[in-house]
Structures are given as C-alpha cells and as structure tokens.
Amino acid sequence: MRKVLRALCYLKELCLMAFFKLIGAICRCCSAKYRELWLVCERGNDARDNGYWFYRYLKEEHPEINARYVIETDSADRAKIEVLGGMVPRGSFSHYLAYYCADFLVGTHVQPCAPDLILFYHLAGKGIRARGKQVFLQHGIIKDEMEWLHRKNMYMDLFVCGAKPEYEYIRDTFGYPEHVPQYVGLARFDNLIRAERKEKMILVMPTWRGSYYPTGEAFRKTAYYEHFQSLLCCKELEQLLEQQDYRLVFYPHIEMQKDSRRFKSGSDRITIVSKETHDVQKLLMDCALLVTDYSSVFFDVAFLRKPVVYYQFDEEEFRKYHYQKGYFDFRRDGFGPVCTTQEALLGALTESFENGMEMQTEYVQRTERFFPLHDGNNCRRTFEAIARLKERNKKHAAESESLSVHL
C-alpha cells in the first residue's frame, strides 16, 4: 500500500511538473516577472543564513537581477524579505510556477527552493529536475564525510565552499566536474566580518545526534543530556560566571530543540534559548567564546578570531549516530582545546578568562590557513561565480545550436 501511495505521489508531481513547465514557458515569454529569474531560499521557513545574506546582496547591489525569495507566510523572518521585496509564499501556486521558471535555484540546502524537498530529492534521483541551474550555498562548512553529497548521489551546478581545506576535500573526493566546487566564501561571513562585536557572554551550542538518537523520556538517559544538564547546574561554572560578570547562553541544535524543555538552568546567569527567540548569527557575533562539541558553527566563531572550546565527551558514540570523520581532525586542525570531561572544560574556560578572552596565537595561525579569504567579499564572489555559470550555459547553448545547424 505504501508503494502504491508513493507511486501516486510521484505521478501527481510529474503531472504538476508537466503543467508548470508548460505554463512556465508561456510566462517566461509573456511576463518579465518570471524571465531570467533567480529564486533564492533557505529551509523555506527562515531568512537568517547564507540564502538571506546573498539575497540581500542581490537586492542592494544588483537590482537589475530578477531575484525572488521563497519563505512561509507565517515565518518570523517574513518582514525581512518584505522590506527587500520579491517574496514568494512557500507552497503557493506562485512558488511552483517560479520554481519551474527560474534560471537559477539558489539555496542553502540540497534541492534548493523545491516546493517539497523529499519528493523532489527522489525525483532528482531519477533524473527528473526543474530547468534551473542548482546553486548550493550550504548552511555550514563541511568537515565530515558526507557521501550523500557526492556527485554520484547529488546533482549540483555550483557547490559553494567556505574554506580552502573544505574546497580541496570536495574537489578531490566528491567527484564533481572541476568547475562545480568553488572556494568563494560563505555569504553570511560578510555580515560577520562587518558586524563583529563581543559581549560578556559564553555561548554553548552543541550539534544534533542523528535521526535515530533517543528522544522523549529516553533522552534523559543519554550522555548528551546528562553532560549538558550537569554543566547547566554546575556550581563551579556559576561561580566562575559570577567572578567574571559573564552570562552563559545554551542553544541546542534546531533538531534537538524538541527536547530542550527537559534542560533546566541552575543559575540566573545561565539561559536556555531556542530559534523562536534568538537568531543564531547574532548569538555568534555577540559571544566572547563558543563551547561546542562537533557543530560546524565553530567555523563562524573561528572566522572572527574568537576563542573556541570543544567539549567532546562522547566521540565514539557520536559517530554511531552521525557523520563519519572527514578531513578535519579536531586536535590537529581545531581552533581551541578539546575537552572530554567537565573538569577539563572548566579549566579551559578559566584559562580563557586569564587570557582576556583572546584566541591563542597557535589557533589564530590555524584560522589564517583555513580562511585565506577574509575580506567581506563572499557575496560578490558568489555572484560572479553564478554569472560565470550563466556565461558557460550561453556558450554551451551557442555551440549546440551551431552544431545542429552544421548537421
């Protein structure tokens, strides 16, 4: 029965695809609204990441580009897009039409701007795609092995890389044509470098643990819960914060926030927050120091030359539920000390206070090697990379037309 329903779902989407392709062809000829369209999106319910910052760049620096942004009408970030103009309500008729009309589909996740991510992922696996060139902006720097993003499993026309070692890893192991992965820098880093500030705040931001990690009441028995709950109620930590007049903000990964209500703070200086109330990028800009386990957000903080401390109490278990290790080794390549116990973590925090919350020279040198592009021009380079892709397509089309004439 499940197979029948899935087949009917595919059939429905194929019919919709044929319909919108036909209507789209007409709209591109008759309406400037859908001609040479760049469609931009993140998860579909937000505007806080590389998609938003690149879209904002397009609207402010290249108003000649016909760009639109897909977002849910009840999103907390809707106003940010309305100010810029070009909002497309997610899942609407205009979303489907724009998706099939667009020359470029630009997003932070695979199958960028798709009305139904999972369905279009499976359709793409069968070679059924929209006409638009797919630009993958990413929503973080890749450090682990992600075979599902290899060329044999995923189609992309432009794969944006945010760091030099990441680019080299993707170029050498993911199997894409040479021109697809490009090191141009993440769009959101432009805002980081322009708006850097530092408050007396420690940010604790652990990553998620995979789809099969225990949830509900079973979550309380996990090492993840036990270690971070212990930290949130640690008297030594509270005393350290009091002595330094600091506060601590605990922001679990979005995928873990369904269980974040189970965490309790042991101090007025320790706050547990979520995506409903706080913007991740603002937290990263505001913090003086980041504590994380394996989350790639540490790249953002390291990009700002702020101290990072890794709290990795469950590395072996983590790999059972999460991605396997890639090119990045935390002890060899990381931007701060690796702690496996709460005692070691408190020691690292104490040392950071003694150093004036400045990143140590050894780690600064590592960031300089990792991020040779550090100039606030990532959006511009991304735009230029898409423009080159556009010219490449024109050249290919002209060559194909010339060949057909000669034949």
Protein language model features and the residues they cover:
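Active-site and donor-binding regions of nucleotide-sugar-utilizing enzymes
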Residues: 37-192
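Membrane-proximal basic amphipathic "stem/tether" segments
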Residues: 1-37, 42-44
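Donor nucleotide-activated moiety binding/catalytic core segment of transferases
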Residues: 89-97, 254-299
